[in-house]
């Protein structure tokens, strides 16, 4: 402490605590937005892999299907009236 008195020392300590809290919160918010952006990019690549030329680079992508679902049974029979 700077030796300016008890009140000044308490205010200086409170200022340092506030600064650490603000820095920690900004770091946490930054990491949250970073992971949110990465997750959104991953979802978009998986959902729309055939757009933008990045579909073949995805792990587990099939060149025959390339992101399109093929029905394996007749869906019309479920909804026919």
UniProtKB/Swiss-Prot annotation:
Signal peptide segment: none
Annotated localization: Chlorosome, Chlorosome envelope
Disulphide connectivity of cysteines: none
UniProt similarity note: Belongs to the BChl C/E-binding protein family.
Residue numbers binding a bacteriochlorophyll c: 25
GO cellular component, as recorded: chlorosome envelope
Role: Component of the photosynthetic apparatus. The light harvesting B740 complex binds bacteriochlorophyll c.
Chief localization: other
InterPro entries in alphabetical order: Bchl_c-bd, Bchl_C-bd_sf
The protein's name: Bacteriochlorophyll c-binding protein
Taxonomy of the source species: Bacteria, Pseudomonadati, Chlorobiota, Chlorobiia, Chlorobiales
A Gene Ontology biological process term: photosynthesis
GO molecular function: bacteriochlorophyll binding; metal ion binding
Record Pfam families: Bac_chlorC
Keywords in alphabetical order: Bacteriochlorophyll, Chlorophyll, Chlorosome, Chromophore, Electron transport, Magnesium, Metal-binding, Photosynthesis, Transport
